[in-house]
Amino acid sequence: MAANQQLPRFETGQVMRTKNAGFTLIEVMVVVAIIGILAAIAYPSYQESVRKGRRAQARAALADLLQQQERYFTQRNTYLAFTSDNAGVASATFPQTTPSPFPFRALSSDGSVNSAYVLESNACPTGTGSGVLPVTECIRVSAKPRTATVDPSVKLLMVATTGEKSCTDATNAVILKTDAKFKLCWP
């Protein structure tokens, strides 16, 4: 040390204080707790808006498929009943043959990664018993979730060429138009 430098002098009982920059552990824990509470409140709302968006995507895909079925009907005087697997590969149901190329989209969006629903088309039920109308008279298009986590409250959205709309819940029970849950399917 140089001879002309002096050390700081302190009065008796004085302590040299240094100012530390940063947060205490308690402050950090309070902030983490607040963020956790906000996330617990916001996440269910976010999930419900994603479900609503997916249902809207399915309804739009059903409307598009119904229009395609009507165009198909005007050209061939019959509707095309088909089923599709989870990958969106569709095949006509008996006794029809599967046209090539397949004229309808079997997923609710263009890419299989973005598609939450698989589309199908079946003959309309008669309304009495277990019979169905011929595909030359009526067709019912439906959208079912590709996985159970897509929409746990609505299992199947359906609309027929007669204009009748319906849906089923997670237990496969038909949700009636008079039921408050029907607005989940068709607002």
Kindly give the residue locations of the regions a language model identified:
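N-terminal leader/signal peptides at the extreme start of proteins
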Residues: M1-F23
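Periplasmic/extracellular, small/polar-rich flexible segments of pilin-like filament-forming proteins
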Residues: A2-Q6, Q75-P187
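N-terminal single-pass transmembrane signal-anchor helix
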Residues: V15-V50
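Residues at secondary-structure transition points
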Residues: N20, K52-A56, A60, S130-P134, ...
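Gly/Ser/Thr-rich helix-start
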Residues: F23, I37, R54, T78, ...
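Conserved hydrophobic beta-strand within the GNAT/NAT acetyltransferase core sheet
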Residues: L25-V28, Q69, A143
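Alpha-helix exit/C-cap motif
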Residues: E48, K52-A56, A63-D85
